[in-house]
């Protein structure tokens, strides 16, 4: 499909279309070239995207939850907030009860790794979060997040915590090797550690 807002190509198979008691399955490959996502979803913060992906999805029903499995996702161009990101890859599983995935970006102005998992307990409605990220280099001015001039950051972070149905957080979040750079110089902030726990009726951060 080619249009004034870019092109898209899909090779997709559908399963269980006429069987109402089974979830609909979708599998295949999708490729876009300069497809203006922002115009499609009416969002000014997003623009053209050039990508390739191979995925499988299940459109759930009352007996089967929805799920998306991304086997490969390679983004050559993604315009977001008026900046063209490049060289992004991702894999992962997304469902109504969780997420488990990995994202790597080697853009000239944003180099980072994110790997994490999220799970929601259907019984207690408690959510478990566990992730690690390493931002090797982020030029916040170049990617239009800081308009004041030179603004660069480097850090790593990890987290392992549970969020209860009441909103309480229990676990730890560690942010380390924080280094900031602006027009006045470079600043090594060091490490920040947050620990939260509860005992009886006491909640401590």
Name every feature range the model reports, one short phrase each.
Residues 1-205:
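Interface amphipathic segments
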